């Protein structure tokens, strides 16, 4: 605790000793006028010097932003070139590649000097001196002088002691703590009847703790203007402007000089004609590059020229008669198999046939049915393997058409049970008996 109290006191004493050495800071009038300080010539001769001697330069470190080059970028720029001569023409568009630097925002530390109050002074004009060791010692001396005068006044006002040894009448003075303030005089009894003799002055007491922090000072003056930052990168190239109006046509130039005399003409019997020549104008002032045609009546006479180039081909002639038929070509490949047509409507139910003879037993009938089914299966397998030609049309009533239909159904729907296959392929016994009866008739 004592160390914490002594450290601020030691700092204050060091600052006061530095200020008490009488350091003076002479500044130019231009620097003071820049920050709004009064001129040294205004007022009395000593007032100007006293108003600026408490200002000092303080080094302040600031962080400012700046742009730093960070590589480069390639940009393709479109360039429009307008017409360089009057009249209608197309604008020329070209492209060029530009390499320009790129920038990024960076921060740097800048050290600048600012005018502020010197250590130990405050206020708007730095004329208020802070509490320091010098002022504290002056106040201590003044307090010691005042205490000595008070003691002299107390000794002069003290009454003489009585001649006899009788004790003075005692009164009931209020309780007073003499150990806390031994030399203090109570206000209730300013003149006691009997007091102890005044002893010698004691040593000065210890310095008390520092007082509370004072209120914040006034706002400082405005600092100097910062340095001008670097120039920013160039902006993008703007779009080309609109096409200008065509200029006025120039004045016609003066007539050219007469040409040289021509050759003498041929005889009157020679053919006559007109010669057209293109001669550029002699006027170069207006920059007109158009060609002017001049018609000169001249008599042509000379040998016939070379043969001209052949003319363009004529239109195609009429279509000729058809030629004889050619030899028959080779037989083509077999076409793809067509899709299966839709199933036809069921036929009309036939007439009821004669009843079959019941002489045959049931075992023989079942054996026949089994043999028939076996034969049909063999035929189906032959068709699947390709022994029989699938394009050949089977004869009606031979049983091959039924086997072929069963083969197609099996290919589309897969294998079916034997009973279902027998029911789809083979006719019933009644139909068989009807067929036998019709064959007998």
From Swiss-Prot:
Single biological process term from Gene Ontology: positive regulation of cell-substrate adhesion
Outline the subunit composition.
Answer: Homotrimer or heterotrimer.
Where is the protein situated, by its record's location annotation? Secreted, Extracellular space, Extracellular matrix
Q: Where is the EMI domain?
A: 52-128
Signal peptide limits: 1-20
Q: Which GO terms describe its cellular component?
A: collagen type XXVI trimer; collagen-containing extracellular matrix; endoplasmic reticulum lumen; extracellular region; Golgi apparatus; plasma membrane
The SS bond pairs are 56-118, 83-89, 117-126
Write down what this protein is called.
Collagen alpha-1(XXVI) chain
Compositional bias, Basic and acidic residues, is annotated for 348-357
Gene of this entry: COL26A1
* Key word Glycoprotein present: yes
Q: Which residue ranges does the record annotate as region Disordered?
A: 156-362, 390-441
- How would you describe the post-translational modification of this protein? Hydroxylated on proline residues.
Which residues belong to any copy of the Collagen-like domain?
199-267, 302-355
InterPro entries listed in its UniProt record: Collagen (IPR008160), Collagen/C1q_domain (IPR050392), EMI_domain (IPR011489)
In its UniProt entry, the species of origin is given as Homo sapiens
Question: Sites of glycosylation?
Answer: 70, 132
The record's section on PROSITE patterns has: EMI
């Amino acid at each position: 605790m004592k160390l914490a109290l002594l450290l601020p006191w030691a700092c204050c004493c060091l600052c006061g000793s530095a200020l008490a050495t009488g350091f003076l800071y002479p500044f130019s009038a231009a620097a003071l006028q820049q920050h709004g300080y009064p001129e040294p010539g205004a007022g009395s001769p000593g007032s100007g010097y006293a108003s600026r001697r408490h200002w000092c330069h303080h080094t302040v470190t600031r962080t400012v932003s700046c742009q730093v080059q960070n590589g480069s970028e390639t940009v393709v720029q479109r360039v429009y070139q307008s017409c360089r001569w009057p009249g209608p023409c197309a604008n020329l568009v070209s492209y060029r590649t530009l390499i320009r630097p790129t920038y990024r925002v960076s921060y740097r530390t800048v050290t600048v000097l600012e005018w502020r109050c010197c250590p130990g002074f405050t206020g708007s004009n730095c004329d208020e001196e802070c509490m320091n060791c010098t002022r504290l010692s002056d106040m201590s001396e003044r307090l010691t002088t005042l205490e000595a005068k008070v003691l002299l006044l107390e000794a002069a006002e003290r009454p003489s002691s009585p001649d006899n040894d009788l004790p003075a009448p005692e009164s009931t003075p209020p309780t007073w703590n003499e150990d806390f303030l031994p030399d203090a005089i109570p206000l209730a009894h300013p003149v006691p009847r009997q007091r102890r003799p005044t002893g010698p002055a004691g040593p000065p007491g210890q310095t008390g703790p520092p007082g509370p922090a004072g209120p914040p000072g006034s706002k400082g003056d405005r600092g100097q203007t910062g340095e001008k930052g670097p120039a920013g990168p160039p902006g993008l190239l703007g779009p080309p402007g609109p096409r200008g109006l065509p200029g006025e046509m120039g004045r016609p130039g003066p007539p050219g000089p007469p040409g040289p005399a021509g050759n003498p003409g041929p005889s009157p019997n020679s053919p006559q004609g007109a010669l057209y020549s293109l001669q550029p104008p002699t006027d170069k002032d207006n920059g007109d590059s158009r060609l002017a045609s001049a018609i000169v009546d001249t008599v042509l006479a000379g040998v016939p020229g070379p043969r001209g180039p052949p003319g363009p081909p004529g239109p195609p002639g009429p279509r000729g008669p058809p030629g004889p038929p050619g030899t028959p070509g080779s037989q083509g490949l077999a076409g793809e198999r067509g899709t299966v047509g839709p199933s036809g409507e069921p036929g009309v139910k036939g007439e009821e046939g004669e009843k079959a003879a019941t002489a045959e037993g049931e075992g023989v009938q079942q054996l026949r049915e089994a043999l028939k089914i076996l034969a049909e299966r063999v035929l189906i397998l032959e068709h699947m393997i390709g022994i029989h030609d699938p394009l050949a049309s089977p004869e009606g009533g031979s049983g091959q058409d039924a086997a072929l239909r069963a083969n197609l159904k099996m290919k589309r729907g897969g294998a079916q049970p034997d009973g279902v296959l027998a029911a789809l392929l083979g006719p019933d016994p009644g139909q068989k008996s009807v067929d036998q009866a019709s064959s007998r008739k």
